[in-house]
Amino acid sequence: MFVPFVLRFEGRRPQARELVLLATMTALAVAGRAAFYWLPQCKPVCAIVILTAVAFTPEAGFVTGAAAGLISNFFFGQGPWTPWQMLGFGLVGFVGGVLFSGRRVRLVPLLLYGFLSVFVLYGVLLDTASMLMYNAAPSWQLWLATCASGVVFNLIHAGSTAVFLLLLYQPLLSKLARVKEKYGLLE
């Protein structure tokens, strides 16, 4: 499930300095997730991944999100949910990059995207994964019940993503734009 995204990223033969920048953004997302461990579902990971994709490329967002999911779970616990989280974080970044990368980004549409993508894309994906992993006989009724039980958690995660986007939008995007222009990275 990750192969097309990784192949597309690797196909452009990234420079070492680009990989260092993505590793830094991944470390920032992991540190943010660890710093807010005490607040359930209030994590800056998706906001950082979205801003990475917006500042650079959709593939950069996917790689940052997938790596952040894998690495942060060394602190939070690996399990059968890890690939699903990696895919969810990565897709939130990739789609954000497709929608916003390479153009002037307005705050309100970005906040709406952050909220909706985390609630619909990440939330439904992880709810579906939970149903598939923990039930021997999946059904549509079971899927609806699983999604319904996750609504509050997904709303909190989506709302916190919008808040983190609001707080990080200007400072992080301006710094990333400066780095991109100065070093000609991820164009």
Q: What do the predicted segments below correspond to?
A:
Residues 19-24, 47-48, 62-66, 83-87, ...:
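Hydrophobic alpha-helical transmembrane segments
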Residues 11-16, 54-64, 103-106:
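Membrane-helix interface "capping/anchor" motifs
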Residues 38, 82-83, 98-187:
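Membrane-embedded alpha-helical hairpins and interfacial helices in multi-pass inner-membrane proteins
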Residues 1-50:
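Hydrophobic transmembrane alpha-helices
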Residues 22-31, 51-56, 116-125:
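Small-residue-rich segments of transmembrane alpha-helices in multi-pass membrane proteins
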Residues 4, 45-61, 95-100:
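Generic transmembrane alpha-helix motif of multi-pass integral membrane proteins
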Residues 31-46, 66-100:
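Interfacial aromatic-anchored transmembrane helix boundaries in multi-pass membrane proteins
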